[in-house]
Amino acid sequence: MRASVLPDKPGNYIIVLRSTSSLPIKVQISTTPILTSFDYKKEKYNVVYVGKSSKSLRIRDYKQHFTGTAGNSTIRKSLGCLLGFKLIPRDINSPQNGKTTFGEFDERTLTEWMKDNLLLFYYANNDYANVEKELIRIYNPPLNLQGNFNKTNLDFRKELSALRSCTSAKQAPIPNNQLKLNTYPQQLQCSN
């Protein structure tokens, strides 16, 4: 993924699994999410997260999500928790504020996992708030915890929220446990 192909404009983005990838589930979680997909160039992509950027798709999407830290990216925090990474206080001088991130090694591991397993589609527009609501309604991405009112994946989102609210990994990792595997796609562009 190259940041230079993303516009320095507001808009929306959809984060999908590469066709050969699945969500990483390395912790005990009882619900398997149902993934919705869309077709792009004769390939199906499972949607895991959608979002909006009010200023710059380049900065929000690439710099915060794909090269940032979990302290500033909800998708990074969700994926890291699913990978079983231990949450630590983000602000050393203010650990009681409840803001968390992962250690340096885990953040690097997460960045590599994301670059290897995810793709980002984007749609530059100025109606990003309404478009985001519609994308969440249409695709029901399991990692969108706010604004997702779909009953499908509700139990998964509750379990993921509980994982994210813990300040330490309370559940033992499960080795090699991975999940098995439409109106906006015409306007979306892939950043890969």
Label for each model-derived stretch:
Residues M1-N192:
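Boundary/linker segments flanking structured domains
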